[in-house]
Amino acid sequence: MTHIIIDGDACPVVDSIIDLTTETGIFVTIIRSFSHFSNQLYPPHVSTLYVDDGPDAVDYKIVQLSTKDDIVITQDYGLASLLVDKVLIVMHHNGKIYNSKNIQQLLDKRYMNAQIRKQGGRHKGPPPFTKQDQKVFEKSLLRVIHRIKELD
């Protein structure tokens, strides 16, 4: 059964994912570090798992829990690269789907930007997340959900 796992520490589309999966039978797990603790109540199909605050603790837990039928939502290219061949789909919160062809290019870009920073340079970060970005993500996730439901 398909399950969505969210890298929840800095994901701006958690509410969208919850809303879009409410009537689908798809369960959602939000994985966060304790430093991002929330008392927010979620619907029955949503669970929250908290892990220690250590570096990459959330990532390690996601890798540990994920299976071939899962959809993982993350903006972390390193985590995505570990999951691309393990899970059904890995998505960015901008709606783009990571795959074995584009992940290496994204990792290379991340490495080059780190080298620029190491030398004292700067590069432009991502623009702020907008309502339009959220709509693009929602449309992309709905396409994925419909494809999965057709296969069931």
UniProtKB/Swiss-Prot annotation:
Cystine pairs: none
Family annotation (InterPro entries): UPF0178
Superkingdom as given in the UniProt entry: Bacteria
Annotated TM spans: none
Family: Belongs to the UPF0178 family.
NCBIfam families: PRK00124.1
Name this protein carries in UniProt: UPF0178 protein SAR0734
Species name: Staphylococcus aureus (strain MRSA252)
